[in-house]
A protein has these predicted regions:
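Active-site gating loops and adjacent loop-to-helix segments of metal-dependent hydrolytic enzymes
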Residues: 51, 63-94, 218-240, 277-302
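Alpha-helical structural signal in soluble globular domains
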Residues: 138-145, 170, 174, 198, ...
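Active-site region of glycoside hydrolase catalytic domains
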Residues: 247-262
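Active-site gating/metal-coordination segments in enzymes
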Residues: 110-250
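Active-site environment of divalent metal-dependent phosphoester hydrolases
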Residues: 62-64, 120-122, 159-160, 188, ...
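Histidine-centered divalent metal-coordination motifs
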Residues: 58-60, 213, 265
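Active-site neighborhood of phospho(di)ester-bond hydrolases with catalytic His/Asp-centered motifs
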Residues: 55-57, 115, 153-154, 181, ...
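Mid-to-C-terminal alpha-helical segments outside catalytic/metal-binding sites
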Residues: 2-53, 57, 63-111, 137-144, ...
Length: 375
């Protein structure tokens, strides 16, 4: 196996340069939520003599005034994780925003696309509308104040699709946001349901990206109990997988072929075991609707979907790229939750990727997909 020293030496000789940083020291690993290297700025990523601007499409934030509208349910919104305090970055808290930017610098991330995991899908229409209004206003403020460092996906009240259409229109055309962050379903209602089609039609019309970030399937809560936080480690990838498979098998992606979708966490399990889907209707025709005739094999829809690179190992990233293509993979970290401690190093150290592929994953694909031209 190639050592890290040998890889770095070889990479430098081949036109790829990067600065390796030990981002998480012992104090951070033992529970401190403060990043130990906030004053450290990584050297720029250089590929073939050109600087690569790195764009993280999967980063989170929260706003306390929006959460407060949840009433008695507000206490359950903040995730039970390291990095939870760093979610709160209102423009009015300059110190918090500067700490976020410093943490990005330490990771080598030039721009984050902020998003808020939907916590309002069970609320009534008016409450959800008020939460989304605050979220999108705060996200737009941050994006306007730091246009070279921060942009965002809007929040939507998808439990009221007609309202979501209006919110998306405003977010893209008036607030300068890049798309919308949505769950893996709307409180168990899957996205292929025709009630959601107006929202997908509007997203396609606007060229807006839909970032699917999962939530643990509530119907499996009993089985997820116990040690290991299985509701997240298994539940989240599973939720994304189910969401994507329904969009494929129910013909939603045929109906909206121009829909731009990014799936978090490498698309869940779909990228790892997609070929099984190509055989399901042959093996069990009774479980497939004869009125739904897909235009291509299920696996061929993967090149209509984008996947973040949050898959942890070089081998997992190699396999994801082999399955979906490097053009469909974008950088994602889940920041400020410390799932991915060395996102740039992860991509750079995956030796099966060409220089062009690494540059594309680190920022080129996201810039093209999100129409980011100010970096």
């Amino acid at each position: 196996m190639t050592t890290r020293r040998e890889f770095i030496k070889g990479a430098a000789a081949s036109g790829l340069m990067f600065c390796s940083c030990a981002l998480i020291d012992a104090a951070y690993a033992q529970g401190s939520h403060k990043h130990p290297n906030l004053g450290t700025r990584r050297k720029p990523v250089i590929v073939n003599g050109r600087q690569v601007r790195t764009i993280d499409v999967h980063s989170h934030c929260l706003f306390r005034d929006a959460i407060a509208l949840m009433g008695a349910e507000a206490r359950g919104v903040e995730p039970p994780v390291k990095g939870a305090p760093e979610h709160y970055i209102p423009l009015s808290d300059k110190a918090a925003v500067e700490e976020r930017l410093a943490a990005m610098d330490a990771m080598g991330v030039d721009m984050e696309v902020l998003s808020i995991n939907p916590f309002w899908y069970r609320k009534d229409r008016d409450t959800a509308a008020a939460i989304v209004k605050l979220n999108n206003e705060r996200l737009a403020e941050l994006s306007a104040a730091y246009p070279k460092r921060l942009t965002a996906f809007a929040s939507l009240s998808l439990q009221a699709p007609d309202l979501a259409v209006k919110q998306l229109q405003e977010a893209i055309t008036k607030q300068g946001l890049r798309g919308a962050a949505i769950g893996g379903s709307v409180d168990g209602e899957d996205f292929y349901d025709p009630k959601f089609h107006p929202a997908w039609a509007k997203a396609q019309e606007l060229g807006a990206v839909l970032f699917i970030h999962p939530q643990s399937p509530p119907e499996l809560a009993k089985r997820f109990r116990g040690n290991g936080w299985l509701s997240n480690t298994i539940g989240h990838p599973l939720d994304t997988t189910i969401a994507l498979q329904h969009l494929i098998f129910e013909g939603t992606l045929d109906k909206f072929p121009g829909l731009k979708i990014i799936a978090a966490h490498g698309g869940g399990y779909l990228g790892s075991y997609a070929p099984r889907s190509d055989h399901s209707c042959f093996v069990s025709p009774v479980n497939c609707n004869p009125d739904i005739v897909l235009k291509k094999k299920p696996t061929e829809y993967l090149n209509q979907i984008y996947f973040d690179a949050l898959v942890f190992t070089e081998e997992a990233l190699r396999h994801l790229v082999a399955q979906v293509g490097a053009s469909q993979v974008v950088l994602g970290t889940d920041h400020p939750i410390p799932w991915e401690e060395h996102p740039v190093d992860h991509v750079m150290a995956t030796t099966t990727l060409s220089l062009a592929q690494r540059a594309a994953i680190l920022g080129g694909n996201a810039a093209r997909l999100l129409n980011i031209t100010n970096v």
